[in-house]
């Protein structure tokens, strides 16, 4: 029997590249998308599903017998533009899948998503969202999401569902009919019987249940007319009541614990997000569950089809999970020791009785593998590596470090050095993250690993303006506070030189999204420092970024976030193209709904007009993630050639 039946053909084709080190083979190995994008386990524990990457941008949903490991495909998405986002078991015979993508709407690019149910044989595909009609008075952009998997009612789900009103074409009664906004429905996936649970509200943003089918929390998005303000109001219900009451105190509810009749809430504690348990019995009693004096608590961990909360997470030098459940805590520790090459354990889901656990085991440098653990037999079974082309490769270790900024503040970062080298006098890459209110976590990064495999030292700074470190670190964000953020990124390059890691004549900067913005702006701020610049899907003009939001409901939020005044000019790489002296290579998808391709079009034109060496590679039909093996392989090949000609390797 093949060891990994989920992708036998891919294994035969791709493992031949694992032992070689030419640019083309490195680009193919690291540019290939995750072989297994996601997995789930059925309530009985007898079946597994996997969303597997196919050729190019395609994805395939496969069903696997947990005992025999026999797998067969049931549906495929083309990625042009629809891609499978996720699939889960609603019962042992019924699945729910989300698919989505981006499409041109007039002069804008807008995202869309749809929910469907289907049998485990791939047949009887049915839409779960509101059916689209010619009389719709708005764009049917998102179907909604599954709110509760109703483990006590197999084959039914609770869905928060988006509704668009229709024009009354009969000429009788009101000119407009139907619901508008976000509501909650119970749906029987076999009969497709829909039972309304919460009437749609135009300003509703989301709901939370107790995992038992009871809607306990409603989040309202405040708006002025149709323009969102970015503020929210939270309401709750007491157990057994239908009356909405104002939620006591501030914070962001993450989950409802039915067992304790409480909500788990993120709220500020000394300028950092902490986790609280807030009673929903009318008392408003609030108890601190967890806080960290350096970083934010960022989420809760759920397990099982009832989505029971079993712990919480935060990231200091790596992502950490703290479990409430002592059995799960002990199990995670034991399993981490049982798989020493993958000490980090993330539980994905469990069978209804909890006897079988689906999990992902990984390390700082390796994306890892999916495993199935049977608590009854104590048997641990490897199901599938996340990235087949890398299973025979020596990957680079990721080291958490810190370095001083120009003002003496210590900046956390990650350093990835080429495996097997001396770590001295290397060509080096500064790789700022996107966001900007995101952060690097020191886990597997295919772009950083590719660069290390090509012989480059790579530093990934969590500059001021990054998320996860509290309000003071976030400050004005990486756009309004660009001088500080870019200064911290510059200090990362100078740190590598000061430690003898980097050859000062062979420094480059590479970034994606905000990271691409930071790469270009850094090259304008420090024209003598970098010898090459790579910007992937970059923001290049802050005023253009604001104007692109004009047709969307979050326009005021975007404009407030980016800011205004002279600094938006000085902080726009497009306006400073003449100051950039290093050659620039840009990549952008023309269906990018996050950062319009116009940013790169204008940037390359401005650079060429200034007499600079610049090139833009446009990818047709791809969005911000460039989630296509062929495109990513081409991009890495071009990056490797470009860097080799600029700073060597």
What residue ranges belong to the model's regions?
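Beta-propeller folds
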Residues: 8-14, 19-357, 364-366, 373
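Conserved hydrophobic/aromatic "anchor" residues
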Residues: 41, 50, 89, 403, ...
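Beta-propeller and related beta-repeat scaffolds in trafficking/envelope systems
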Residues: 135, 242, 251-255, 376, ...
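Flexible loop/turn segments at secondary-structure boundaries
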Residues: 204-205, 272-273, 296-298, 317-319, ...
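Generic beta-strand/beta-sheet core signal
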Residues: 219, 237, 312, 360-362, ...
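Active-site-proximal cap/loop segments of hydrolase catalytic domains
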Residues: 463-649
């Amino acid at each position: 029997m093949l060891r990994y039946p989920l992708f036998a053909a891919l294994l035969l084709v791709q493992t031949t590249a694992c032992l070689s080190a030419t640019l083309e083979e490195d680009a193919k190995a690291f540019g290939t998308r995750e072989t297994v994008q996601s997995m789930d386990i059925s309530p009985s524990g007898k079946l597994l599903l996997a969303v597997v990457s196919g050729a190019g941008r395609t994805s395939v949903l496969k069903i696997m017998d947990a005992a025999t490991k026999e797998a067969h495909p049931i549906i495929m998405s083309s990625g042009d533009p629809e891609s499978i986002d996720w699939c889960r078991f609603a019962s042992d015979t019924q699945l729910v899948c989300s698919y989505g993508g981006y499409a041109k709407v007039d002069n804008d690019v807008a995202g869309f998503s749809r929910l469907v149910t289907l049998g485990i044989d791939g047949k009887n595909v049915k839409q779960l969202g509101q059916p689209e009609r010619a009389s719709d008075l708005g764009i049917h952009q998102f179907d909604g999401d599954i709110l509760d998997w109703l483990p006590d009612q197999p084959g039914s789900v609770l869905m928060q569902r988006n509704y668009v009103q229709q024009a009354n074409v009969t000429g009788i009664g009101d000119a407009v009919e139907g619901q508008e906004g976000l509501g909650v429905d119970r749906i029987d996936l076999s009969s497709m019987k829909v039972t309304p649970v919460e009437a749609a509200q135009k300003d509703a943003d989301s709901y939370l249940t107790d995992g038992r089918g009871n809607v306990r929390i409603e989040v309202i998005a405040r708006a002025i007319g149709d323009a969102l303000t970015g503020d929210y109001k939270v309401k709750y219900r007491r157990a057994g009541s239908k009356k909405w009451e104002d939620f006591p105190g501030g914070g962001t509810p993450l989950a409802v614990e039915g067992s304790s009749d409480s909500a788990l809430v993120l709220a500020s504690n000394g300028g950092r997000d902490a986790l609280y348990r807030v009673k929903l019995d009318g008392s408003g009693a609030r108890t601190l569950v967890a806080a960290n004096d350096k970083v934010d608590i960022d989420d809760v961990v759920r397990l099982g089809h009832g989505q029971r909360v079993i712990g919480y997470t935060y990231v200091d030098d790596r992502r950490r999970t703290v479990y409430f459940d002592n059995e799960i805590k002990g199990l995670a520790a034991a399993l981490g020791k049982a798989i020493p090459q993958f000490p980090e354990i993330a539980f994905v889901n469990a069978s209804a009785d909890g006897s079988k656990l689906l999990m992902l085991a990984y390390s700082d440098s390796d994306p890892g593998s999916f495993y199935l653990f049977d608590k009854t037999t104590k048997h641990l079974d490897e199901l599938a590596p996340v990235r087949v082309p890398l299973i025979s490769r020596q990957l680079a270790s990721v080291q958490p470090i810190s370095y001083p900024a120009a003002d003496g503040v210590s900046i956390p970062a990650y350093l990835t050095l080429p495996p097997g080298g001396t770590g001295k006098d290397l060509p080096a890459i500064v790789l700022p993250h996107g966001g900007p209110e995101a952060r690097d976590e020191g886990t597997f990064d295919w772009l950083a690993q590719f660069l290390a495999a090509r012989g480059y030292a790579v530093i990934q700074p969590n500059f001021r303006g990054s998320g996860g470190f509290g309000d003071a670190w976030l400050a004005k964000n990486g756009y309004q506070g660009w001088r500080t953020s870019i200064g911290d990124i510059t200090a990362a390059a100078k740190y590598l030189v000061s430690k003898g890691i980097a050859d000062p004549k062979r420094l480059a900067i590479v970034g994606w999204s905000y990271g691409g913005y930071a790469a270009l702006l850094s090259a304008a701020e420090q024209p003598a420092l970098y010898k090459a610049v790579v910007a992937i899907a970059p923001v290049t003009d802050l005023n253009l970024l604001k104007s692109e939001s004009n047709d969307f409901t979050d326009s005021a939020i975007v404009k407030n976030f980016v800011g205004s005044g002279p600094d938006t000019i000085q902080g726009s790489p497009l306006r400073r193209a003449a100051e950039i002296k290093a050659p620039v290579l840009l990549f952008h998808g023309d269906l990018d709904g996050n950062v319009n391709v116009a940013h790169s079009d204008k940037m390359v034109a401005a650079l060429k007009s200034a007499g600079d060496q610049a090139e833009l590679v446009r990818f047709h039909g791809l969005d911000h993630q460039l989630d296509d093996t062929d495109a990513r392989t081409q991009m890495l090949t071009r990056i490797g050639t470009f860097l080799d000609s600029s700073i060597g390797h």
